[in-house]
């Protein structure tokens, strides 16, 4: 069967149009990802009503305990690039520390909106860093996140954890004796095994530039500071392990 030049030309045009449309869609997706990554975000901290101020004066100021790795940041060191980090993705900062007499560089990526998150929650809570990492590394990361603002002064490290069955457990009683006022934000359920009713789970973060988990938590943290006992709320929300 002979194919007419007109039919061949039409098929060629259709094939070209399909390729062109695929390229346009690629450019649109790339631009959309850029818009998401660099969008301006806000969470308005409005003046409290007289009733809210009165309520807040009747309860203790709460303590928010913050994990570092995969909660606020993600890092990898020299020679190790995890598949979760896209090759060529620039780190937010580089740390140079000495571990066992060997210099090691850590390439640290900040979770989206972490600076804004810390700025807001530091107005509501006393912030405490509690990481299972070594102090020489955890302290350097906390210094960068604090950025001389003085909101991450209290810090606890691996030596303050308890090692059980190969996992580091964080004892919140070393942070504050009154656990009714303590909240921990951590991506690892094993870390707060001893205090599940004080925990807000958060999904682990590695590289997704469109992640909004920290922003999603702000309304809850805003409301939680008004409670007399945080456990009365958090004990009802174990299903949150899949939400954030």
UniProtKB/Swiss-Prot annotation:
Changing residue 67 to E: Strongly reduces phosphatase activity. One of its GO terms (molecular function) is phosphoprotein phosphatase activity. Its main location: membrane. The chain crosses the membrane at residues 7-29. This is CTD nuclear envelope phosphatase 1. Residues 58-225 form the FCP1 homology domain. It is a single-pass membrane protein. Its EC number is 3.1.3.16. Serine/threonine protein phosphatase that may dephosphorylate and activate lipins. Lipins are phosphatidate phosphatases that catalyze the conversion of phosphatidic acid to diacylglycerol and control the metabolism of fatty acids at different levels. May indirectly modulate the lipid composition of nuclear and/or endoplasmic reticulum membranes and be required for proper nuclear membrane morphology and/or dynamics. May also indirectly regulate the production of lipid droplets and triacylglycerol. Induces neuronal differentiation by antagonizing BMP signaling. SMART domains: CPDc. It comes from Xenopus laevis (African clawed frog). GO terms for cellular component: cytoplasm; endoplasmic reticulum membrane; Nem1-Spo7 phosphatase complex; nuclear envelope; nuclear membrane; perinuclear region of cytoplasm. InterPro entries: Dullard_phosphatase, FCP1_dom, HAD-like_sf, HAD_sf, TIM50. It is found in: Membrane; Cytoplasm, Perinuclear region. It catalyses: O-phospho-L-seryl-[protein] + H2O = L-seryl-[protein] + phosphate; O-phospho-L-threonyl-[protein] + H2O = L-threonyl-[protein] + phosphate. GO terms for biological process: cell differentiation; midbrain development; neural precursor cell proliferation; nuclear envelope organization; positive regulation of triglyceride biosynthetic process. Interacts with bmpr1a, bmpr1b and bmpr2. Belongs to the dullard family. Keywords: Cytoplasm, Developmental protein, Differentiation, Hydrolase, Membrane, Neurogenesis, Protein phosphatase, Transmembrane, Transmembrane helix.
């Amino acid at each position: 069967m002979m194919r007419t030049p007109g039919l061949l030309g039409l098929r060629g045009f259709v094939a070209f149009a399909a390729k062109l449309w695929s390229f346009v869609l690629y450019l649109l997706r790339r631009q959309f990802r850029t818009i998401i990554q660099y969008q301006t975000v806000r969470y308005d901290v409005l003046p409290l009503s007289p009733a809210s101020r009165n309520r807040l004066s009747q309860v203790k100021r709460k303590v928010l305990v913050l994990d570092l790795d995969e909660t606020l940041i993600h890092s990898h060191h020299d020679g190790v690039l995890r598949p979760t980090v896209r090759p060529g993705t620039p780190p937010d900062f580089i740390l140079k520390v000495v571990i066992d007499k060997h210099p090691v560089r850590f390439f640290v990526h900040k979770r989206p909106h972490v600076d804004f998150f810390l700025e807001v929650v530091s107005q509501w809570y006393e912030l405490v860093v509690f990481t299972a990492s070594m102090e020489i590394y955890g302290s350097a990361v906390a210094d960068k996140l604090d950025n001389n603002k003085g909101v991450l002064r209290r810090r606890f490290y691996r030596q303050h954890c308890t090692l059980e069955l190969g996992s580091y457990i964080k004892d919140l009683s070393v942070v504050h004796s009154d656990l009714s006022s303590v909240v921990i934000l951590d991506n690892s359920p094993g870390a707060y095994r001893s205090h599940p009713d004080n925990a807000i789970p958060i999904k682990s973060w590695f590289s997704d530039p469109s992640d909004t988990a920290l922003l999603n938590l702000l309304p809850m943290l805003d409301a939680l500071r008004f409670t007399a006992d945080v456990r009365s709320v958090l004990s009802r929300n174990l299903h949150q392990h899949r939400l954030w």
